[in-house]
Amino acid sequence: AVSVSAHTHYMEHRFIGAEDGWRGKQKHHHIVNVTVCGSWWRGRKNERGIPHATMKDGAPNGYSVMEFDGAEYSLDFYAAGRPAEYQMNIYAPEVVAQSELIKTVILANIFNGSERSQVAMRVDDQGEWIPMQQASMVDPAFRDEKLREEAEPNRTWTNLPSVYHTPHMWRAMMPTKLKQGTHVIEIRAQ
């Protein structure tokens, strides 16, 4: 079974089971869908004069397309004004001292992610895929943007909503055996 709701201005997948009172054979998939207006058209205006409207879970405003084939279905997320491939934000420091690698965390906000998502990262295209762990937390970029925008004395936009602990964040530790130099982090989500 599947159901969809919205008007919460964030995206989330919930799987409702017997512990929640659901009596079906399989868990009920409830989708809290994104909104086109994101965070009610709030936030700093972009180059086109439109508020960025990032939602409180750090996901961009957008829409979903749901396709059905009998009892099977798929849900694809599309960020407004962005290419279809824009499905996540990755958070990693630009510079890390060799001695700090052991405590460096890489984060990914997989906008359409759920507890059923398999997320992994690797450093450089030859590296081993490292599983990432789901972590309910505040999107750091959303939090920082909210603080920056609220600190501006002459703002001409409406403040962003309160931060939200989103379940579609993943984290992993940076590998410690990296040579000094520039590296590329790649993240895949299935």
Predicted segments — roles?
Residues 1-95, 128:
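Conserved beta-sheet core of the metallophosphoesterase superfamily
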Residues 88-190:
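Long, low-complexity serine/threonine/glycine- and acidic-rich segments characteristic of extracellular
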